[in-house]
Amino acid sequence: MATIQIKNIGPITDTGIIPLTSVMLVIGKQSSGKSTFLKILCFCRWMEKLIMVSDEEAISQYTHNLKFLKSMKQFHRFNDSYFSSASSIRYEGDTITITMENILSDVKILRKPEFETVRYNTKLSFIPSERNLVSVIRNIDQSYRSAESDVLFNYIFEWGEAKDSYTAEHPKRLSFTDNIEYINDGGNDLVRLINENKMIPAYYASSGVQSAMPLDVMADYFTGLVGKNASVSKHDLANTLARYLGKDKELTNEMLKSISNKMKYQSVQLFIEEPEQNLYPDSQRNLTINLVCALKQAMPKGRGDSMLVMTTHSPYILSTLNVLIAEAYAM
């Protein structure tokens, strides 16, 4: 089982060794390190995904010139004050290990012995607490500016990708309410009141809809990608074939299987900050159940480990997961 341990980063003193399960909930008071944990875990999982689908240069690139730490700080907007000489990360993934002993030395990234046979492609998405920005700021995809790609830039990009699938002919029924659908009308975000057959721009929707709608839509879209072809550039495909053909004159069934695992998404990993935002307890429950169900439906379609990791302040989210666990054990 994959694990992670984080010490002396931001509010975190020592997480201990935490096993990574398919559904994880990090609950606690504000400013206790929940988001810090989520962001570091997400970055380590992304690092593993990059190495699994890339060529030999990926490890070398991130184990020199402090690139691992610099990239993590830049993407997740960590301040320098979060780190000290005592900061450390120990991540043991499915196919690699990452060890950061301090901020002055490069990380060590090692492939596990079974790397070549186990490696696979996975779809990751970090859905931040600021997700309602895509609803409350018009044309945010055109107005948001960042000197470098960061978590918000990436989120806005992924939202644009996800919402394209949900048109008037194929709307997304929102799980946290029983009377609203999401529709992308030529790039405009609309919600339809089903009982009244009335369209409302998301800009004018309630705060609960503005917060939960992007989460609901993106979770549905990305869990639906498992088992489908991944977007792979011609350059990456050529490098993959060259690496295998460089070892042998012809492709074996094992090599073809490994290539196939890279060409299709074998799992999905969702990292969600505060899914409860602006939602009534009953709506929190419905949204949580839908997220778990979407993950469960995606799992049989791939061979990798799918994950749903959430941070929350809400006892209702915790209670819902406890009930689901109790029901699973009862079965």
Segments predicted by a language model, with ranges:
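Bergerat-fold GHKL/Histidine-kinase-like ATPase
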Residues: 174, 183-188, 196-199, 212
